[in-house]
Amino acid sequence: DLELTATPGALYVEVNGRALYVEHGVQVRDGRIALPLEVLAEAAGLQLTWDEVEGAAWLSTDQAQPASASYPAEDLYWLSRIISAESRGEPLLGQIAVGNVILNRVESSQYPDTVEGVVFDTKYGVQFQPVSNGTIYDAPASSSLVAAKLCLEGTDVVGESLYFFSPALSAGRWIVSNATYYTTIGGHQFYV
């Protein structure tokens, strides 16, 4: 069975417990919900084939299996909490960006190789203030849970960024002096 929820304007759709990113948001055209074929194919477990020359697309139903959620429970638990604690009140893209930094660190040889390990890393001192002040243990906002799922699905909005900070809350002197600026999303600056 396929259960898909698409809210006009949202940057994601929910499919059988998964969150799938919709780059330009869920749109309404002529009174109907419009979604990219890539998202529909992923949601329904269909194979999508493009013919660039003809400008045509084919969806194959051979062995179609609707998407279902299968996120590593521990990764979802800690990723949603660090996203919530670090970016509560930020737009969804800003929350995804914070999650991207965590996952980029997991992939980097400079940091521990698990989400929990990155969150609680103290190699160069506590990395994230929510670990120091205990807000890491607060229940995550629902949007942070969605952002974590989107990150675990591979949604990436900050490239290979390994650092972020909020200029309104911190001078970020070390980051500004030692890393390359990438972008600003919401109240955070991101650095590679």
What are the roles of these predicted feature ranges?
Residues 1-80:
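Primary recognition of N-terminal secretory signal peptides and signal-anchoring hydrophobic helices
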Residues 66-192:
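Bacterial extracytoplasmic/cell-wall-associated proteins, especially those involved in peptidoglycan
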